[in-house]
Amino acid sequence: MQLNSNEISELIRERIVNFNLESEARNEGTIVSVSDGIITIHGLADVMQGEMLELPNNRFALALNLERHSVGAVVMGPYADLSEGMKVKGTGRILEVPVGNGLLGRVVNTLGQPIDGKGAVSFDRMDPVEVIAPGVIDRKSVDQPIQTGYKAVDSMVPIGRGQRELIIGDRQTGKTAMAIDAIINQKELGVKCIYVAIGQKASTIANVVRKLEEHGALENTIVVVASASEAAALQYLAPYAGCTMGEYFRDRGEDALIVYDDLSKQAVAYRQISLLLKRPPGREAFPGDVFYLHSRLLERAARVNEEYVERFTNGEVKGKTGSLTALPIIETQAGDVSAFVPTNVISITDGQIFLQTQLFNSGLRPAVDPGISVSRVGGAAQTKVIKKLSGGIRTALAQYRELAAFAQFSSDLDEATRRQLDHGEKVTELMKQKQYAPMTVAEQALAIFAAEKGYLTDVALNQISRFEEELMAFGRTNAQPLLDKINQSGDYNDEIESELHSLLKEFTALQS
């Protein structure tokens, strides 16, 4: 088929008329190298630190190195099919995650996408993962307790709402168990919880989720997962994503608790990314800003004042303070708390609960070492009844440890020393507690009262656990109004003291 000159000119005229003159400005670059999840991009202009870069097949990378002629970015997800020459687009957005009440009861990944097979997540809004922590003027002092349900913690190292309390110890010393029990204990107290699992085995995380579900605490909890098999970038970002989800509740005048399990693995993931980006290594091969990595995260846990909440909610919530309490976990190697990351996090947080392998293996669980465990601000927040009753607990345990070491070299001890050793031994036994069995304030007060007022003197050491169980059952059956009164008010006065004495006298009379 041949076209004549008229037809050709008509086709050209039609093309000219229909030519699309619209232009689109796109910030686009080209991948010049891919290795170990790190891509180097040439040609991208106006990229922000931490910006989301769009890759083929609906994937994203995070811009971390902004150099004169190229951008170094870390891929969030699989990268095996990426190759040189592929196009990368700038989005102009910092990473955001979904937040809101709809996330409670769900298991999500670092990006807030559901991984529990329960369908799409309902959320209120998208918030950036990196935000500046509230300033000094916006904060309120910590003076309300957060109950972990552990006698050893609530009596000796109390935690307040808005505090950062580090849980530190070797592997297999009960760090995760303590954090999970603290979450389970919040289900009746109206505190929303976020559990961030970083670099853990998927089977371990599945077990934690199952336990939370069994104890009715999952519906009050958001579980954020960046398992060991996921990209280092997702493990590095997971704590920030979880913190943003927790800040949603804090900024609306509610109380939230977040557990980072654990920040050692986040630091290792960040070290991996930094070394691949060719940043200069420092002590233990960590980059120079590893302190800032954790400080900017943990400073976001705070108790904010009424004015901050009112300003944030545009006047919708008035006269309420909000709080985000953080329980970061750090794993030590052979009990070395002087390593780089542990010392960093100890200096950032408001105290630490040190779990010791030796105590754990000797059967003392939770294996809290009262010698170096401390709460720097929690004392002001401690429930009055526990504060007044537990004053002698730490002293008794410290003196017992000292005397026990001394008694090994001496057989003839005077009566006062024997009594002190006996009391310390029984208090140590009383501090033991089963997993997934958090205690109310009243139950803790009753147990500590029995120890402090000498009701354990005639109880054999191997009978302490049975004595405590039977005492709790007796109290729930015969003195529930008293326990309710202590739980509601948290006060301790002469009337409550005499009622506790009456209860224990009645109970010990039945035992004899």
From Swiss-Prot:
Disulfide bridge partners, by residue number: none
Domain of life where this protein originates: Bacteria
Chief place of localization: membrane
CDD domains recorded: ATP-synt_F1_alpha_C (cd18113), ATP-synt_F1_alpha_N (cd18116), F1-ATPase_alpha_CD (cd01132)
Site description Required for activity, residues in chain: 373
Statement: the UniProt record of this protein carries the keyword Transit peptide: no
One cellular-component annotation, GO: plasma membrane
One term of GO molecular function: proton-transporting ATP synthase activity, rotational mechanism
InterPro entries xrefs: ATP_synth_asu-like_sf, ATP_synth_asu_C, ATP_synth_asu_C_sf, ATP_synth_F1_a_nt-bd_dom, ATP_synth_F1_asu, ATPase_a/bsu_AS, ATPase_F1/V1/A1_a/bsu_N, ATPase_F1/V1/A1_a/bsu_N_sf
Localisation per UniProt entry: Cell inner membrane
Enzyme Commission code: 7.1.2.2
The entry's keywords: ATP synthesis, ATP-binding, Cell inner membrane, Cell membrane, CF(1), Hydrogen ion transport, Ion transport, Membrane, Nucleotide-binding, Translocase, Transport
Membrane topology according to the record: Peripheral membrane protein
Protein residues bound to ATP: 169-176
Catalytic reaction annotation: ATP + H2O + 4 H(+)(in) = ADP + phosphate + 5 H(+)(out)
Subunit structure: F-type ATPases have 2 components, CF(1) - the catalytic core - and CF(0) - the membrane proton channel. CF(1) has five subunits: alpha(3), beta(3), gamma(1), delta(1), epsilon(1). CF(0) has three main subunits: a(1), b(2) and c(9-12). The alpha and beta chains form an alternating ring which encloses part of the gamma chain. CF(1) is attached to CF(0) by a central stalk formed by the gamma and epsilon chains, while a peripheral stalk is formed by the delta and b chains.
Role description: Produces ATP from ADP in the presence of a proton gradient across the membrane. The alpha chain is a regulatory subunit.
HAMAP family (alphabetical): ATP_synth_alpha_bact
Family: Belongs to the ATPase alpha/beta chains family.
Protein name: ATP synthase subunit alpha 2
Organism, scientific name: Vibrio campbellii (strain ATCC BAA-1116)
Gene name tied to this protein: atpA2
